[in-house]
Amino acid sequence: MHYSVLLQESINDLNINPQGIYIDATFGRGGHSKAILNRLTTGRLIAFDKDLDAISYARENFQFSNFEIVHASFASIYDYCLQHSLLGKIDGIIMDLGVSSPQLDNAARGFSFTHNGPLDMRMDVSKGITASQALEELSVDDLSYIFKVYGEERFARKIALRIKDYIQQNGSISTTLELAELIRATIGKKEKKNPATRCFQALRIYVNNELKDLEALLENILAVIKSGGRIAAISFHSLEDRIVKQKFSALINPKQELNRITKMLPQDSSQIKLKWITKKSKANEDELNQNVRSRSAILRVVEKL
């Protein structure tokens, strides 16, 4: 079953205007979209998702006249709003940056290191390279960098060397458990977390261009939102949260130094201002008991002045 993490908190903090125009940047299975639609009267909602399964689900289950689903990355939200004369007219944006439960639980998608399936990991299976292809094409140095930066993996180079050696001997790594077992055999189990966790995260981020897409969205987000409009971001790992926090902070306090990861201070910072609505919120005990995956979720909400 799919749970939308921090659902009530994020929707409440968006302060929904029943006549407003809203964007769900990550439709998933529509938990946040449904909650927004329930609060709209003459307003409308535009949702984005790269996952064709999510698009199919939306078209089957969200047949509302004030709802539109767009098969695209949230990085294209600015371009969409530009093309549809919506720049500066959006009342709020919700982005739930986590991988959805249906994606994780469906072994055929290749995201899980506990269920065997093809090593794919693409959010949009209609294009791009699979995780298996990425492992074959990337050099040891590039693979090590991805594991270290995107996965914060201490043994990045050791794992990268083992993977490339394995591929040289066997031709490819084609399944999720094949990769997970190779990582476990390389570094052992040194903590409670599955030893493949960080590398799978890193590979998923790389295959789906996740951080660059997030940067692209945040780079132009204030041109999309109207004055008084709000942005709610739910992140699930430190890299995402760091980008969100530092971008928001830079727009609230433009004098702070450049973010070493994103380099994204606004060009004319004196003209751009936000205020915090929720600086940091985490799932409460009830939600943690319902959905263990919510334990790492962080909600941050800002308002454009």
UniProtKB/Swiss-Prot annotation:
Its EC number is 2.1.1.199. It catalyses: cytidine(1402) in 16S rRNA + S-adenosyl-L-methionine = N(4)-methylcytidine(1402) in 16S rRNA + S-adenosyl-L-homocysteine + H(+). GO terms for cellular component: cytoplasm. InterPro entries: RsmH, SAM-dep_MeTrfase_MraW_recog, SAM-dependent_MTases_sf. It is found in: Cytoplasm. Its main location: cytoplasm. It comes from the Bacteria. Keywords: Cytoplasm, Methyltransferase, rRNA processing, S-adenosyl-L-methionine, Transferase. One of its GO terms (molecular function) is rRNA (cytosine-N4-)-methyltransferase activity. S-adenosyl-L-methionine binds at G30, G31, H32, D49, F74, D96, Q103. Belongs to the methyltransferase superfamily. RsmH family. NCBIfam families: 16S rRNA (cytosine(1402)-N(4))-methyltransferase RsmH. Specifically methylates the N4 position of cytidine in position 1402 (C1402) of 16S rRNA. This is Ribosomal RNA small subunit methyltransferase H. It comes from Francisella tularensis subsp. novicida (strain U112). The gene is rsmH.
